[in-house]
Amino acid sequence: MTENNYGIRDIKNQHLKYSYKKYTDLIIGFEKHAKRMYDDWVIDINNRNIIMHKLDNLVRSMIKIYNECIMEIYNKTPNENESDNISNTNKKINNAIYNKIYNEINKIERIENKNNKLVDSFNSIREQLIELAKNNGFHTINDFIGLYVGENYESLFNNLDMETFELYKGVFVPLSISINKIKKKYRDTDKQDTITISKIPSKCDGLIENTCTVTITMNNIFTEIIFEGYVSADILNAYLRTSQIYSKHLFNVKNESKRIVKESYPHVDEYFIAKYAKLINSNVYFINNPDEMATKIDSDYMLFTDLTAKNFNTIVKEFVNSNLPTMFSYINVLLMGSNQDVNNAGLLFNLLKDRKIGSETLSDIIYHNLSFHLQIKLKKIINSIKNELGKIRSLTPEEIPIEKKLASMVNMPENVKNYIIEKNNEIKTGENNYKLQMAINGLMQFPWKPKDFNNNNYFQIKNSVTKSRNYLQNVAKKLNETVFGHENSKKVLIELVGKWIQNPESSGQVIGLVGPPGVGKTLLAKGISAALGIPLSIVGLGGMSDSADLIGHSFTYAGAQYGMIVRQMIKAGNWRSVMFFDEVDKVSKRNDTNEIYNTLIHITDPNMNQNFQDRFYSSAIDFDLSGVLIVFSYNSSEKLDPILLDRIKEIKISPYSLKEKILIAQNHVIKELCSNIGFDRDKINIGDDIVEYIIEKYTMEAGVRELKRKLEQILLKVNIDRFYMRGPFYNLLKKYNPETQSDDNSHSLEENQINMYVDYKPSLLEKNSDPNIINKIFNLDIDDHIIITKELVHKYLDKPTLTTEEIHKTNMIGVINGLYATSVGMGGIVPIQIYKNFVGDKNDGSNLKLKITGNQKQVMRESVMCALTTAVNVLNNSIKSKILDKFPHGFHVHAPDGGTPKDGPSAGCAFTTAFVSAILGKKINRHVAMTGEIELTGKISKIGGLMLTTGAKKAGIKCVYICEDNKEDYEIIKKKSPELFQDGLEIKIVNHIIEIITDPNVIIDIDVNDFDKDLISEFKKLK
């Protein structure tokens, strides 16, 4: 055998050893990777063993391949023509040549391995490692790229950001890998390679706020590699602290996010920002871009301010019912606060000592994900309370020693703590133990006024115009998102928030929302709570008569407990809260005394509500309610106690206009109903005209409750038709089966007997249709929509039950259109009829006797009397002298629909005009209506509102006369409901009855000479 031949075999042997060592290193790296995943709670012991088993098989395969290759190299027959005589000099020369060849082989392998051009003895090992890495990741990013592309992969990068690459290859742990080939139309070898970081949700419990994808594009080989994994712990935050020199990427994320927070989230305290960057685990800076990082800082700050304002018992209740990431966030942000906050974090952490996920305790997982500085803080506080909390083994807050609870409650007044300790010592075997424990628990859970307002949002923004303005804008935005309309209410709330910003310690406010049922008073209260970020508690007062329900029973009573006010404050868990008292005008009296109003007067007095007392505590405890925003809702302010009403800032909630109702139905109600019933909203077509038709013909309300019920009734019936292929679904079936024989299915829509469901028989069309088509129609997996028509509305809701009062058919003497408004904000016309009275005796001394019918109440009756006097006085003396002869028994005044009570002064000018018409015997234009209170002088006075004009147009009225003093109300309605004044409805503004009765558009063929000349002359002068 020649030396030359031995040299070639040595080269092959060296190359084999090199490859063997390379794959051995990769397998060992994968072994370490599996151990790291197990240690970091990414995989359990079973999955780790599966990976180890696969790696063990790879080692066995690799040894087998190596032995086979060695045998093949050294068992080959030597070349007989080779010379056996080689000098030492030639050996050195040849060794140099072999070495060069060996290096070139390795170089070729590194460059061309990407296309598998070199036959690698261990290629099967390589492929198995790549396959294993797809679902389990790899030791490092660069190890995998070296395996997949070749060790000389860096030479293939085209201007890649190597600093960022070097950073992430040192800290990022891949958990799964996907490889995509760049499509031909996007290939460009001159294009710069990129490395992109994107945050992703964690897929396992052990990883909290450190998961992301690292995507690397390599344009030279048309490949994109996506690594999904997590950033390994840098608990010292060394990378972040040295980022100014070490990493431009991290330094940019840190500084840019801080800038964005200051500009976009000015309410975030600068001290918190600085503390946050120092204490937070730097993993979050690796996985977030600057915008995302700024959002996270704001989110954590809002959580921090929320937690520091709550009492500890409330925090515990929320904490133990949260998921692991939320628990981590609670502890993480509390550790950044004051000593009291850190103490609370330690208490929460100890609650998790015995709680596990799999074989790992939640406390270990949370501790592992904290930064080093927070770990030290947590360790210190745990050691300081270890002896006191050593016996805690459950998650119930009741088992925490009461002394420790009191120590953690820095906001609780000292006299309250003394009271609790005193009552706690009294708890012995006896019948009052339950009440004593209730008294203690109530005080422990009550949200006392914070002693330190430094963490209060308003204190932190009050001196910055930008922060204050942005906060107000944010409140307004949240209100608009929560509540539709009600602009005046929102303005009042903005003013209140403005007061709180300038004086964070100022008292709350008492707001009264007055309006008809169903217009969103409760929703507005919820919107206030959401916009301010404070809790809402609701107290229903309807039918309540006993003040003890609100302020508690005396402790000595059997079954005594504290009242609803204290109970709702405990439920809210925050000194700043919204307390909503619903149906205030529906409370009941007790022994001719309204105890409820007396209690409400007490809690709304700003001088007294700081010392509110509950009878259950025998006047020993003062509860501070000064931070509560009290909101009352009622339908009418007339029923409220004047003293209580005087303390309320009243906001009138107007009924929704037709346009608003349609918008609410289309954008909210139908969407919600479709979701609840199981329809795709896009597949249900209920046009605005149909919604308007349902509103006008089937509902009589200020809000949208009945409208929602009617729409729900329609959709529920449509849903039943879906099961039986009836109605609109039958029509779709006919459309998709035009050639299929069908029958008349109309009877199924009319059928309402329960037997139709029991004895149902499919139609001939359904029997002859393709089942696949039927299922597609059933699931609305088609291009067509279900269109709700008037015909379907009639079938589902029956014929309309409401009728609109229309104007009389002809112009008549003594008959005029008055206007009415209901308690629900609806309006319309009410015909007023004045005729000669044929009952009575003109000689009985009761000249011009008035007979009033139609269920007219006291105020309306007085208005009729005033109208008659005014009508007579405006006529000339000649006509006056003939009235008694013409109407010997006076007048009969009637308002049709006697079953409906009618009251109020707003028909005064209508009565007057009708009297004038009856006396003169001249007809009144049937297309005219009017409203306004009449005075004896003929002046028309202001009425309560103009909502009664809303029904005039529907009734056929073309012209409405209103009082000049109501011009502002007219402008509001015109702005809110411009559609009312379209298509020819004219509004005339008047000040005196003369302007109406002398108008030929009102009384036909009227002659100005019929009236008192002096009165006409005086009116013209004033005009």
UniProtKB/Swiss-Prot annotation:
Q: EC number(s) per UniProt?
A: 3.4.21.-
> Which GO biological-process labels does this protein carry?
chaperone-mediated protein complex assembly; mitochondrion organization; protein quality control for misfolded or incompletely synthesized proteins
> Per the record's keyword annotation, is Ligase included, yes or no?
no
**UniProt-annotated binding residues for ATP:** G515, P516, P517, G518, V519, G520, K521, T522
GO terms (molecular function) for this protein are: ATP binding; ATP hydrolysis activity; ATP-dependent peptidase activity; serine-type endopeptidase activity; single-stranded DNA binding
Keywords, ordered alphabetically:
ATP-binding, Hydrolase, Nucleotide-binding, Protease, Serine protease
Which InterPro entries does this UniProt record tie to the protein? AAA+_ATPase, ATPase_AAA_core, Lon_lid, Lon_proteolytic, Lon_Prtase, P-loop_NTPase, Ribosomal_Su5_D2-typ_SF, Ribsml_uS5_D2-typ_fold_subgr
Q: Which PROSITE patterns match?
A: LON_PROTEOLYTIC
List the active site. S906
What residue stretches are annotated with the Lon proteolytic domain?
810-1003
As for family, the record states: Belongs to the peptidase S16 family.
Full protein name: Lon protease homolog
